[in-house]
């Protein structure tokens, strides 16, 4: 893929235990991986997640990256608003975004997972500037989801 026209975003959701754990991890991955500098990630947060006060942490190890905590809850943002972020970011940066989600079968373990799956499909199917790659290590669970 041409990096000038395609931006890949990867997240592993193995440790996500709930729908809003996923939305937080999803939004952080998008903000960090579509920005080439921390300053741009912060600008993206200010533009697209204006109702949040992110917490940014730095590691004393100069090799380590910074981390962002958004604390997204249903009070601040609806699931649909978070799921629309890739499309909004793709338009802003002028690239097609490919979101790769590993351990996708975890969604099947969440409370009300059928509703979450319908919500994801309902939003994602209308996005024109974003593609999704869904990976899972438990074939039977992935088959059940689809």
Where are these regions (language model features)?
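Sensor-1/coupling segment of RecA-like P-loop NTPase cores
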Residues: 91-100, 106-112, 119-146
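P-loop NTPase nucleotide-binding core
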Residues: 1-97, 113, 130
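A generic local structural motif
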Residues: 84-86, 117-122
